[in-house]
Amino acid sequence: MALLGRLLPLALALALGPAATPAGPARSPYQLVLQHSRLRGRQHGPNVCAVQKLIGTNKKYFTNCKQWYQRKICGKSTVISYECCPGYEKVPGEKGCPAALPLSNLYETLGVVGATTTQLYTDRTEKLRPEMEGPGSFTIFAPSNEAWSSLPAEVLDSLVSNVNIELLNALRYHMVDRRVLTDELKHGMALTSMYQNSNIQIHHYPNGIVTVNCARLLKADHHATNGVVHLIDKVISTVTNNIQQIIEIEDTFETLRAAVAASGLNTLLEGDGQYTLLAPTNEAFEKIPAETLNRILGDPEALRDLLNNHILKSAMCAEAIVAGLSLETLEGTTLEVGCSGDMLTINGKPIISNKDVLATNGVIHFIDELLIPDSAKTLFELAADSDVSTAIDLFRQAGLSSHLSGNERLTLLAPMNSVFKDGTPPINARTKNLLLNHMIKDQLASKYLYHGQTLDTLGGRKLRVFVYRNSLCIENSCIAAHDKRGRYGTLFTMDRMLTPPMGTVMDVLKGDNRFSMLVAAIQSAGLTETLNREGVYTVFAPTNEAFQALPRGELNKLMGNAKELANILKYHVGDEILVSGGIGALVRLKSLQGDKLEVSSKNNVVSVNKEPVAEVDIMATNGVVHAISSVLQPPANRPQERGDELADSALEIFKQASAFSRATQSSVKLAPVYQRLLERMKH
């Protein structure tokens, strides 16, 4: 596809001549799609265009690149056919469509493009056919035969029963008193029709579809001696009301009418511009819980956000949607507007009950479901659409619901449901305090967080922000989904329960019996002060079992030389904080010893120097501890002086710690993750 994307402009230029070259005049989206259709039909002869027909219908489209490969329009399969491009015709015995259509007047051209019903109705009026056959220059947007036959019987009867007034006026509304080709049909422009100078709304979309009062151009740019004919798929009628006026007169918009008046948006909806209003009906409002609806209606800012979320920044006719589009609302949210067959969808749901109600300043689609933006929601409501239901139940059980439904400015750090696959912690005072430390005292946005920032929690703790290349973490927990910003609170979906730091690295090691031998070694090497003071350390902490696994001779040699012991221990300490969520395929972390540690993560297993880490992310106020089951060796350990004066005392302390470890090993069992987390909070 990438190669095709580079070659396609060149191929188009070769196929179509100088007008298609990059140096030539700019082409409209319609012309670009037509060029692509011509390129696809070239193998069938000159001036042949590929056309996609929607199976089971008579709807045809010139094909763009995406549709050509997908063979779908609005999710429905299409078949490819080949026909003469506009302005050309077949010649018996010749390949393709080599002959240009002979030019005739507008009336005759109506027959050429297949608009025979429009031609017939033109005949019935006294004045119009002479104009179409006489001098001048006109554009006619001619309804197809199917367009006339699909009119309601009462509408058609009213037209044909008064041909020299009603029918004549209707046909004149389809005409402009000059020649207008598709290149001149600009998105959002208005053309002055030949009926009382009433405006015709033009929209020219990036996908090449052109609409006239939301009727799609089927065959465009058919030249005549006195103008041009564009075939369209609907009979269009005059538009006199703006969006606000339509809201005022439609009974189904009673609630919407009151909401617009309360928000002050009526000025926008009756002014100039081109908008799409996804207008919720009374039934749409009734589907919302009364408590939620009353809260929003009583909050001017939330109400304005709610209504703005139903207004698109430009007019979007239904016929312009042939695949999913991401469209931004005035509120700032992006809606996925798509189609499935004849149904329009919003965010994948077929909630549009009436489409293409035209206004002078846009178009209205009726919807039967309210589109509440995140900016109008409470934290509870934000969570309902996120993968955090288990965490929300914990907050509710712990009596913290008021924080999630009120007007308190805060940020909720909610672990995703998979975090609790092995169960949830018991609800008690310590769990409640832990949950309070998942609430930040301000409404934040992740895009404004920076490395080293500290955040105050409702539980009284300070949490640190760590920014890594591919992740953004708060203590040991990293943000797993885009944050959702509500009316007062912001929801961060986190990848694990957060562990607030409870002491220095030395405090953490001393409080865990698994590290008693390491603590003894640190004390003997004179590193206690280093790991107690302020700093940013990552400690790969060998457990007692790791030391006991060393050959006895090697262990004695190590403990007999304090400088070498310090050198090896420093190799276990990185000079920055690296939590597991910040580890990518490979991170090289500089140690206090000077050499670098190679830290990696694969299939949720963290390794250091290819040795698996037994437990990650034991948080400390000056760093993080990762438990490992082996003692790491520097890549090149230079000879050190023995430091004999410390050797005996160091070895004795180490032996005592080792003995203590063996004595307690059989009775001390690893607690479940939540129990260990809660135990740490005691200190």
From Swiss-Prot:
The modification S-cysteinyl cysteine is found at residue 65. A motif (Cell attachment site) lies at residues 642-644. GO terms for cellular component: extracellular matrix; extracellular space. SUPFAM superfamilies: FAS1 domain. Disulfide bonds join 49-85, 74-339, 84-97, 214-317, 473-478. It is found in: Secreted; Secreted, Extracellular space, Extracellular matrix. This is Transforming growth factor-beta-induced protein ig-h3. The gene is TGFBI.
